[in-house]
Amino acid sequence: MSIDSLPPLREVIERHDLMPKKSLGQNFLFDLNLTSKIARQAGDLRDQPVIEVGPGPGGLTRALLAQGAYVTAIERDDRCLEALAEIAAHYPGRLRIIAGDALEQDFTALFPEGPKPRIVANLPYNVGTQLLLNWLLVEPWPPFYSSMTLMFQREVAERIVAKPDSDHYGRLGVLAGWRTQAKIAFDVPPQAFTPPPKVMSSVVHIVPRETPLPCRAEALGQITQAAFGQRRKMLRQSLKSIGGAALLEKTGIDGTRRAETLSVEEFVALANACLP
């Protein structure tokens, strides 16, 4: 079934009264060229499983299905379910719709066998960062997904790919750099969305590392949270609540340094020093 045989998105939104809700962080994409570009960025999707979070009225969903994917769409806004069901009727057996909150979803249980899914989504802005953190810290590793192609506010995208000694470097950059290889694929202007956000957006492509540096995710999460929670303070101060003096001595890291100067490898060393 061709994507062209579906009614225009604007018509669907009017018919189902689907004005985006600010409380849900919704910004809908109408540009079919753009949604197709996002789908292509995820790679060859023919007969491949894809997880989409926050599909809304299904603009990106249509593009993923048109590329031949088997899509599992997770949507918490009940208003959108009927519009998604109409798309599913055009692609029998290719669109599974799960009504619920992605933050409460057990993603590892969605695909118990077969190829690993790719995650492709225009994430709701109010939960996008937390979802990414959950996916970066998931156990076991390698993770349940083979790649992620995700839309974020530009500022969040820059934090994901940031390197030490840069303005955007922080906890997100350390965790992403430890377990994945991430790049900003392209930017998306505000006028591509309804309603237009006040900032530029970016699509980030993320591929898991098969063998990241050995480290407990929980420990690294704790270290980075403490270090960047007081990022302007020296490490001997910011890590004080978690026994920082002993950790710094054990790793040979200068306690007068600040969090943004440490490499991913140094953060991993601190996390491993937490082990008894």
From Swiss-Prot:
Write down the chemical reaction(s) this protein catalyses.
adenosine(1518)/adenosine(1519) in 16S rRNA + 4 S-adenosyl-L-methionine = N(6)-dimethyladenosine(1518)/N(6)-dimethyladenosine(1519) in 16S rRNA + 4 S-adenosyl-L-homocysteine + 4 H(+)
The record's keywords, sorted A to Z, are: Cytoplasm, Methyltransferase, RNA-binding, rRNA processing, S-adenosyl-L-methionine, Transferase
Q: What is this protein called?
A: Ribosomal RNA small subunit methyltransferase A
At the top level of its lineage, which domain of life is listed?
Answer: Bacteria
Localization per Swiss-Prot or TrEMBL: Cytoplasm
Q: GO: which molecular function terms? A: 16S rRNA (adenine(1518)-N(6)/adenine(1519)-N(6))-dimethyltransferase activity; RNA binding
What InterPro entries does its record include?
KsgA/Erm (IPR001737), rRNA_Ade_diMease-like_C (IPR023165), rRNA_Ade_Mease_Trfase_CS (IPR020596), rRNA_Ade_methylase_Trfase_N (IPR020598), rRNA_adenine_dimethylase (IPR011530), SAM-dependent_MTases_sf (IPR029063)
Native species: Brucella canis (strain ATCC 23365 / NCTC 10854 / RM-666)
Q: Which GO terms describe its cellular component?
A: cytosol
Q: Where does S-adenosyl-L-methionine bind?
A: 27, 29, 54, 75, 101, 122
Q: What class of enzyme is it?
A: transferase
Reported EC number(s) for this entry are 2.1.1.182
Family annotation (SUPFAM superfamilies): S-adenosyl-L-methionine-dependent methyltransferases (SSF53335)
Give the main localization category: cytoplasm
- Gene name, per UniProt, is rsmA
This molecule's function is given as: Specifically dimethylates two adjacent adenosines (A1518 and A1519) in the loop of a conserved hairpin near the 3'-end of 16S rRNA in the 30S particle. May play a critical role in biogenesis of 30S subunits.
What family is reported?
Belongs to the class I-like SAM-binding methyltransferase superfamily. rRNA adenine N(6)-methyltransferase family. RsmA subfamily.
